[in-house]
Regions:
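An N-terminal assembly and electron-transfer interface module characteristic of large anaerobic redox
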Residues: 1-157
Length: 157
């Protein structure tokens, strides 16, 4: 296993792993390279997705997820399995076309996010907690889903 915070010694072993798990869009190019060069297969998903989901009834809910693309898509797949009616993802950063689903949106600025929330009729929003105050009129459930590139925080409040 090698990931953020590991030293070069761990990264040097990348060609010997049995499978890569791509947890961010930024890692996709490296995974493709390792597959092409060494035959190492890869999967794209966030393995800890259930830790991000509070125990709620998602049945019939319309959900917006604003996060990096792999985490957002992993949350989407889990919510759809739990009965969500629709799940749309959006993000400000790298959006790989091979990870896009119909309705996914690349945000240019805060106004894009505000407009999406105002016009989206969402029941639930998953996004970094610092974004909650951008849409004080949102009456649904806001779930703080930490996004380091947005708030600069890895964990905590």
């Amino acid at each position: 296993c090698y990931c953020m915070g590991d030293g070069l010694e761990e990264v040097k072993k990348a060609s010997s792993v049995s499978k890569n798990i791509v947890v961010s869009p930024a890692a996709l190019m490296a995974a493709k390279y390792l597959e092409k060069t060494f035959g190492t297969p890869y999967e794209i998903y966030y393995p800890l997705v259930e830790e991000l989901l509070p125990e709620l009834d998602y049945t019939g809910k319309k959900v917006l997820i604003v996060h990096q693309q792999v985490i957002a898509d992993s949350i989407r797949r889990e919510l759809l399995e739990r009965g969500a009616k629709t799940v749309q993802t959006a993000g400000w950063f790298m959006m790989k076309k091979e990870l896009l689903a119909d309705g996914d949106m690349s945000l240019r600025d805060e106004d894009d996010y505000i407009e999406l929330v105002q016009n989206g009729d969402f029941d639930i929003i998953f996004a970094d907690g610092c974004m909650e105050r951008m849409t004080p009129e949102f009456k649904g459930r806001f779930i703080n889903t930490r996004h380091f590139a947005v708030s600069g925080k890895l964990i905590g409040k």
